[in-house]
């Protein structure tokens, strides 16, 4: 896809990831300014905040299909077996680890997270505690010492038997958590995932396992840490010969009843007010996804920086995986891991 943008051979209408705007069109050269077709594409159905997130180089280069964020999901059946309610706070979660180990066994954990999940939860924790965004104006807002605090928090979850080690997850032999037998049978009783992922994880559970939406924790600090992001966008190629027709198609899919019914919530809870109303009026929303999405968007204070998801950081050979795996294996202490993380992030931001 990146080659098609570079060579001008991309389709007229594109479904893109949000960070593609900054990756492929930081100067506005790849995507058409949708403000030019606002007489056809009804932009009033989208919040100013959401449109601003897609505005780069003073051009509205895409329109958001949906917004998403991270939240906890729990296997209530396993918590019931442990004699516990599902966690409403960080304190509840920390207390659950030893209870799971004592009452259910060493293989049971209240929560399971891979390296990228851990990075996001660490950022939630730090933003809650320190009250500032992770990155702002293309600059990392946290010192190595503050990040070390966040890494120690992640280590404390392992130490308290709240989450399994990376080695344990690797030994499970599953390519992803939803395909892990320990998630399927309830031995891993929680995940920290995008609100739109509910169906995938619920569908993977064995029969009889009850899956519920959790809460955003408010006892990590005085601020509401965490972030929402545009989960997916529609964009028009800059070199299109048919901008009006492209705008009409996007408006049909996002704002008009017939098109909205086709899309439903397959790509998340609609960011368009008109689209959301159509889905609500026609019972087209997955109830758990809708519940999770409303909780996330009501809680978070911060926007995700688009470079947070840069390949050099989030891919399995990237900085996040190196840092979190190294910390879990004991290859790095928190100070070393913080230095590596800062260096890797600043390298991406400075490109």
PLM region spans:
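Hinge/lid segment of periplasmic solute-binding proteins
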Residues: 17-70, 146, 212-215, 288, ...
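Glycine-centered hinge/linker elements that transmit conformational signals in sensory
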Residues: 97-98, 139-171
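A local structural motif
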Residues: 9, 83-85, 137, 158-173, ...
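C-terminal capping/gating helix-and-loop segments adjacent to ligand/active sites or protein-protein/ligand interfaces
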Residues: 228, 290-349
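Extracytoplasmic "Venus flytrap"/periplasmic binding protein-like
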Residues: 1-46, 77-88, 181-190, 204, ...
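A structural signal for short loop-to-beta-strand junctions that line the ligand-binding cleft
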Residues: 3-4, 11-12, 41-78, 109-110, ...
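Mature extracytoplasmic/periplasmic domains
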Residues: 30-33, 196-199, 216, 232-314, ...
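Short helix-initiation/N-cap motifs at beta->coil->alpha
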Residues: 18-19, 90-94, 167-184
């Amino acid at each position: 896809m990146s080659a098609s943008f570079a060579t001008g051979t991309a389709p007229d209408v594109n479904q893109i990831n949000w960070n593609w705007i900054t990756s492929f069109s930081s100067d506005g050269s790849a995507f058409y300014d949708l403000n030019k077709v606002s007489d056809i594409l009804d932009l009033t159905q989208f919040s100013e905040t959401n449109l601003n997130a897609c505005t780069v180089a003073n051009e509205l280069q895409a329109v958001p299909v949906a917004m998403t964020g991270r939240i906890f999901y729990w296997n209530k059946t396993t918590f019931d077996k442990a004699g516990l309610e599902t966690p409403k706070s960080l304190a509840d979660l920390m207390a659950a680890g030893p209870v799971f180990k004592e009452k259910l066994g060493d293989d049971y954990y209240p929560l399971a997270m891979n390296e990228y999940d851990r990075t996001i939860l660490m950022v939630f924790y730090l933003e809650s505690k320190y009250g500032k965004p992770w990155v702002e104006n293309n600059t990392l807002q946290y010192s190595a010492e503050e990040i070390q605090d966040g890494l120690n928090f992640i280590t404390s979850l392992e130490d308290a038997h709240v989450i399994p080690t990376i080695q344990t997850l690797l030994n499970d032999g599953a390519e992803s958590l939803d395909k892990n037998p320990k998630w399927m049978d309830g031995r891993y009783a929680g995940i920290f995932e995008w609100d739109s992922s509910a169906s995938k994880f619920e569908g993977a559970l064995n029969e009889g396992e009850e899956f519920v939406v959790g809460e955003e924790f408010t006892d990590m600090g005085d601020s509401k840490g965490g972030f929402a992001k545009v989960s997916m966008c529609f964009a028009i190629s800059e070199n299109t010969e048919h901008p009006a027709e492209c705008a009409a198609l996007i408006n049909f899919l996002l704002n008009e009843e017939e098109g909205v019914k086709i899309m439903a919530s397959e790509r998340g809870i609609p960011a368009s007010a008109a689209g959301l109303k159509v889905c609500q009026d026609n019972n087209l929303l997955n109830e758990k996804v809708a519940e999770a999405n409303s909780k996330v968007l009501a809680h978070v204070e911060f926007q995700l920086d688009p470079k947070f998801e840069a390949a050099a950081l989030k891919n399995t050979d990237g900085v996040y995986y190196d840092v979190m795996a190294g910390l879990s294996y004991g290859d790095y202490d928190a100070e070393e891991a913080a230095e590596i993380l800062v260096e890797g992030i600043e390298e991406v931001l400075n490109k």
